[in-house]
């Protein structure tokens, strides 16, 4: 009997949606490094070419997924450092490889973005100082449909207070979902928190980040393919709750179809729906 020698199989690169869970349980204990405080984390390993600039991260994509928004932010804000924070190990590995390949292909570019594996629901203040961030994103987070798991949602009164701590006065928080119930949950929590107020409609409509949160992520494009609907909003970090305009008429931005990523306005393709204050 003759045995044929089998060639070793080549290691396949990690691809989006390939045998990777859509979400991870933030309540589970994961064995990974996290800093004891912002001063103890070495950011130079994430941004090697920015080491001498002494810049600080100003933009965070919480639950960054496969890095679609992160890569778009690199071009939109070339002078700012952006970081993606993700819990799933294989997804973080994929984003790291994706950024490395972009840096190799486009010399000198994409040096202002990076990704970290961490549990943002537990350790976000361990990475950022008070008032450090100018923008924070929560794009298509895990809905945690069961009532018993609502405590695992990325938006809650307690977590919003932590986000407010690391956001600078006037900084923006963006969130979007293709699940209306989850969107309304996030909206109500932001609206009712004393340190956040909704951004004025005309400002939100012309925000250059809006087309990105709607269409730059893999999850957003997946919703487009099935002609799904998205609900999103922008809130501002405030410092004085007593000056919050209680007569402000809240609204919701919706996207029934794709927004042109080359434009900075959503009026032609997104519908503005009034949300009555409760």
UniProtKB/Swiss-Prot annotation:
One of its GO terms (molecular function) is tRNA binding. S-adenosyl-L-methionine binds at residues 63, 86-87, 119-120, 139, 217-219. It is found in: Nucleus. One of its GO terms (cellular component) is tRNA methyltransferase complex. It catalyses: guanosine(46) in tRNA + S-adenosyl-L-methionine = N(7)-methylguanosine(46) in tRNA + S-adenosyl-L-homocysteine. CDD domains: AdoMet_MTases. One of its GO terms (biological process) is tRNA methylation. This is tRNA (guanine-N(7)-)-methyltransferase. It comes from Dictyostelium discoideum. The lineage of its organism: Eukaryota, Amoebozoa, Evosea, Eumycetozoa, Dictyostelia.
